[in-house]
Amino acid sequence: LDRNTAELLVQRFRQGSTLICGGNSSGKTTLLNALKETLPDDMAILVAQQADELTTLFHPDMMFLHSLPGTSESSVNYDLKHISIAGLTMDVDFFIIGEVKGGEALYLLNAAYTGQICAATVHAPSADRAPEKIVDYAMYDSRYSRNELMKMMDCFQTLVFMEHYQVKEIFACLGWNAEKENLELSLIHISEPTRH
């Protein structure tokens, strides 16, 4: 990323909810790790994750919650969905889910829709398709219609697509278009193709 685009991305990350998407090993978590380190020290941050991929070396008020799968020896089972529900009751300024893979999407979406600044990663083939993937996961646990959930996705102000550890696209979400029944997105960055 050039300096201006990097600064724009950091500014948008600090001010509104961000969804980072891409394929396997595309750099989603690497980017999220870097962006969360730019958050101010006086901001309370909750990170919910399945694996220890997101860490901090510097931030004084970043709390990490990890999923705990049930085993044959214990009936205790805290998946990302349960952690996300608990996260909604905590007094935090910023809520992060390392990777959305299931019903926790509904609680991430609810947090963002009520004004909580959130960030997450999700597997999706492009930035403009990422909201559909979050809605697919949210449908696992939701009584909302698909259309209602898509409307709620307008609370994610920034959508980023990663590929080969490069930011390929950044979209700004302009809101829900009731007439077309879709999210209005504006492309604010597209990377130049790499030359070989």
Mark where each language-model region is.
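P-loop NTP-binding catalytic core
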Residues: 1-15
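Switch/coupling sub-region of P-loop NTPases
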Residues: 17-24, 34-152, 164
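Conserved glycine(s) of the Walker
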Residues: 27-28
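Hydrophobic positions on the alpha1 helix immediately C-terminal to the Walker A/P-loop
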Residues: 31
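Phosphate-binding/switch region of NTP-binding enzymes
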Residues: 148-178
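Conserved small/polar residues in nucleotide/adenosyl-binding loops
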Residues: 188-196
